[in-house]
């Protein structure tokens, strides 16, 4: 080892190794696929509690609801959604 070396493998040596690409050829596409399925199935909306794109407004409304009372905003929106 050279003086001042931390003992870690150089980055170039890691990315040119067969072992690195065997591992990452499986993990990188599977992470992408898992993320795609998480979003496309709607599970992301359920997990984070956000409304789905078609649930922002009621069918009879054409614009966003306006909240008039700052501290009563949630109750105003709850009344509107009933």
Swiss-Prot record:
GO terms for molecular function: electron transfer activity; heme binding; iron ion binding. It comes from the Bacteria. Belongs to the PsbE/PsbF family. Keywords: Electron transport, Heme, Iron, Membrane, Metal-binding, Photosynthesis, Photosystem II, Thylakoid, Transmembrane, Transmembrane helix, Transport. It holds the Pfam family Cytochrom_B559. Its cofactor is heme b. This b-type cytochrome is tightly associated with the reaction center of photosystem II (PSII). PSII is a light-driven water:plastoquinone oxidoreductase that uses light energy to abstract electrons from H(2)O, generating O(2) and a proton gradient subsequently used for ATP formation. It consists of a core antenna complex that captures photons, and an electron transfer chain that converts photonic excitation into a charge separation. One of its GO terms (cellular component) is photosystem II. This is Cytochrome b559 subunit alpha. It is a single-pass membrane protein. Heterodimer of an alpha subunit and a beta subunit. PSII is composed of 1 copy each of membrane proteins PsbA, PsbB, PsbC, PsbD, PsbE, PsbF, PsbH, PsbI, PsbJ, PsbK, PsbL, PsbM, PsbT, PsbX, PsbY, PsbZ, Psb30/Ycf12, peripheral proteins PsbO, CyanoQ (PsbQ), PsbU, PsbV and a large number of cofactors. It forms dimeric complexes. It comes from Synechococcus sp. (strain CC9605). It is found in: Cellular thylakoid membrane. The chain crosses the membrane at residues 22-36.
